């Protein structure tokens, strides 16, 4: 593992015919980096959006996280990503607030991001 990285799963999100519609991943463990970066990431190809595929994938990842004895997860979004914020609300995540990224955070350094909306999910 690279420095400060954690074990993770990555999956394609596919329909019943095997067509790839997007991707999702689950990061295992707890750290300051995961508070800001989140345990779950997802992306859905534009033509498949609006069908709750991200939410369905998250529900499956919640079950996988339980198998790793995780008691809660964070999903973080860019504050202006209304679609992802709606997914977190749809999944009944607890909105913890909008947090400023630390100066030494990779997302701040590499991606020029400054803030994250953070949602907590008790499993």
Model-derived features with residue positions:
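Acetyl-CoA-dependent GNAT
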Residues: 1-35
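Short hydrophobic/aromatic beta-strand element in the GNAT-like acyltransferase core
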Residues: 8-12, 23, 41, 74, ...
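Conserved acetyl-CoA binding element of GNAT-fold acetyltransferases
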Residues: 23, 35-46
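Conserved acetyl-CoA-binding loop-helix of GNAT-fold acetyltransferases
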Residues: 42-44, 50-67, 86-90
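Conserved GNAT acetyl-CoA-binding A-motif
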Residues: 65-76
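Conserved catalytic-core motifs of GNAT/GCN5-like acyltransferases
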Residues: 76, 94-111
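Conserved active-site alpha-helix within GNAT-family acetyltransferase domains
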Residues: 80-97
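Ser/Thr-rich low-complexity repeats and stalk/linker segments
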Residues: 114-122
């Amino acid at each position: 593992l690279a420095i400060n990285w954690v074990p993770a799963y990555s999956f394609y999100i596919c329909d019943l015919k095997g067509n790839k519609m997007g991707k999702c991943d689950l990061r295992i463990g707890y750290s300051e980096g995961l508070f800001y970066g989140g345990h779950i990431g997802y992306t859905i190809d534009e033509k498949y959006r609006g069908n709750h595929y991200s939410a369905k994938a998250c529900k499956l990842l919640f079950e996988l996280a339980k198998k790793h004895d995780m008691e809660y997860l964070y999903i973080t979004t860019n504050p202006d990503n209304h679609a992802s914020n709606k997914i977190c609300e749809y999944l009944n995540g607890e909105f913890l607030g909008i947090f400023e990224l630390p100066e030494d955070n990779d997302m701040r350094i590499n991606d020029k991001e400054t803030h994250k909306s953070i949602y907590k999910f008790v499993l």
